[in-house]
């Protein structure tokens, strides 16, 4: 037990490992009693290894399922879906799920079936480590069934193995060949394969709330016909061709729907009914809000049939109905089914607002489509009503966005990547606290980083740009590593807990050593290695980032300051203050902060490259303020609006992208007294998204993810605008002294009850739960934190 506890994050060590009197329930939480990791012999390291395992057991009072796996599992009890998991963990670890089976058991014999996937490929979503399943059904006094003793299994041949990936960032797409009903498959004993011990991992508690599996019905909204337009064009996206991802060669694909579907043309028909569809016909389904989860189809096949399911976060442009490659994905699920009843949900979670079902051959009737949701139920805790319905609607869209991106770790999107990106997490973590009253998902995210071993393809001291992940090359973003330490400080202040910071001491020391290598004679970072990334705009062009990149140095100064405060290092605080002055001296040309300087004859020379985003980095980092650079601040506030015509205003100055430039702009405007300007801009920016998909987007347009975690930060901006709430400092509630702009009622959750704010007419007041107290601040802040 002590050996196990030595490997656990400090959060759990402080809660359990330091106690000498752990009760039996605590011990059981950290380990399996008898289960061992297993897999089907010879398949634990193969690409896209999908297996079925099963065990029969007698019903018993208090029975629970304890389970983990790598990469993922889906559990069924007596044919009924139980759960998908586990929550992701660092290399060498696995998070353990525990479920009560009390309400699901039937008298006598019960059958547990587990569908498990070991992807064994490189991705931003899961680890490239050997597959295993570890599970047991138990009561307080007995183990009723466990892997290594009672489970049988087989390769899940119904799922086609050699297929295209879903995306560059995620593993393999889904194609199935069912010779009998899936309901029969998931309610039958799995046998025929040799189940053997496998390489496992150190178990950890799940740490986060179990997801909500609410079913969302998609309504039939159209139908039509399709036909082959011409010979299929080769579908050769990078995730189809780059061998370093660990993929199957195209020549070995057993099916390739992305290619043959690309040759189809569509003809809309009349009516919406999906009661009967023949070969060459399609039905279209939609939902009012973009949903994240498992796509489920139910129908009756009048004969053996082939069906393709295309899905996307928005309706396609005519003549296509669903652009299944729009978001850099192969968003297709393919089925070959036998005559009879059929019902199946995708193994993996995806996102969809529009779903198109194509009958490739055969005939089906009574088609129904739904999504089994996969989201964080705690996001419902924030309550807000407001006389401005636009603000209400944006907050509701932010709620959906946060819930879908805070399931096991903080993710960028629940579609293309499901990856735990730094920088994004800084913003979504603040939103998690606002919506849920806690930061359980961020804690798990930061624990994974703290537990991550040194990765072979990264320089010494560097942390991965997203995690848990196994990259296909040595790509890393030094700027995102800076955001890691900035977030650690923000998390510590926000939660009042030092667990994450204490667990990350070595990571912080490693990063400080890493960046010190690039400091020049002025203390400025010069010729940073890796992918110097600021945002997707001209600010990130090679001409702007080479040499001494000033936005990177502005962020470095903030990183040093936050790290100094976090660990009580006065020398880092002094270094940060000095660096801010140095950056301003070298970057500011009298009107604007320039983006970079390069060496010419041994001297640093500014090159006249100016981005709008650089200006916001300056104010966000504390290099600039309205007091020190008042003229620039006024110009940015009044003239450099999102609607700026760059050919007339600020000629030659690159416009920002949504993330991160526009977000930094909104923060700067809010904190430095331009609340009404900020409100006008964020309503204009986010409201159209909320109306169209009920979620908030990666970009200002529809070219990327339409459900992106960091965008939930819109709710933080709105709540601050309405009542002055700026977040928590432990149990202190930070409140700016403002005049509320309209009538509203807000309940901000905490573990002890909500912080309430009411504004009616000229009267407004706060009410605080026991243990929480206000910390009032000036409406115009001293720094943009």
Segment roles from a protein language model:
Residues 420-746, 752-756, 763-777:
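Active-site core of glycosidic bond-cleaving carbohydrate-active enzymes
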Residues 274-275, 283-286, 343-345, 593, ...:
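Generic recognition of long tandem-repeat/solenoid scaffolds
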Residues 64, 296, 756-758, 765:
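Short, surface-exposed charged micro-motifs
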Residues 69, 118-120, 752, 761, ...:
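Beta-strand elements of well-folded, non-transmembrane domains
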Residues 351, 761-762:
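Short "repeat-start/strand-capping" segments in structured domains, especially the N-termini
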Residues 11, 17, 22-415, 424, ...:
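Extracellular/oxidizing-compartment recognition motifs
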